[in-house]
Design a protein with these regions (language model features):
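Metal-dependent nucleic-acid phosphoesterase active-site entry motif
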Residues: 1-24, 37
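RNA substrate-binding interface of SAM-dependent RNA methyltransferases
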Residues: 35, 40-41
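Nuclease catalytic cores that cleave nucleic-acid phosphodiester bonds
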Residues: 4, 41-142
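Short, conserved loop/helix-junction motifs that constitute active-site signature segments
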Residues: 27-31
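Glycine-rich, phosphate-binding/catalytic loops in enzymes
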Residues: 23-26, 129-131
Length: 142
């Protein structure tokens, strides 16, 4: 059976702490059984939660998002599997996280969960599926 995969962008990991939505449960309910978090996304999330300049809601949402990733990595009892994907053989240090996400989505035939309008536009240009927050209370796929 083909596992439906979804790659998660940094801003999507802020959804639980900002809107109180369990993205893992929502993704499972949508049939995504493999949730992939790029290493570069974890680095961005870690930088947000440890940033001296980041204050308030964003920093708190980043801390919640980071803890939930760690919690779901350790929980193997759900229907879905959460993995952190290491950077591939690409040695281009200038490759940005969005380009890395697009490359991974193409290679793994995966959808992408993001709230970034520009990334969604680029994904659609490549013919890739996206999942996004609609109405501040649910995830939808297009």
């Amino acid at each position: 059976m083909h596992k439906r995969k979804v790659i998660v962008d940094t801003n999507a990991l802020l959804i639980p702490g900002t809107f109180g939505i369990d993205i893992y449960e929502e993704l499972e309910d949508m049939g995504y059984l493999e949730i992939i978090i790029p290493e570069s996304v974890m680095e961005e999330l870690n930088a947000l939660r440890n940033s001296e300049s980041e204050k308030g809601r964003t920093k708190r949402a980043a801390q919640i998002g980071y803890q939930l990733v760690l919690q779901h990595l350790q929980l193997a009892n759900g229907r879905s599997r959460v993995v952190i994907e290491r950077k591939g053989g690409d040695t281009d240090r200038d490759r940005d996280t969005d380009s890395e996400i697009i490359r991974m989505a193409k290679m793994q035939d995966a959808a992408v969960l993001t709230s970034d309008a520009e990334l969604r536009r680029r994904l659609h240009q490549e013919g890739l599926s996206t999942v996004f927050l609609r109405g501040r209370n649910r995830l939808v796929a297009d």
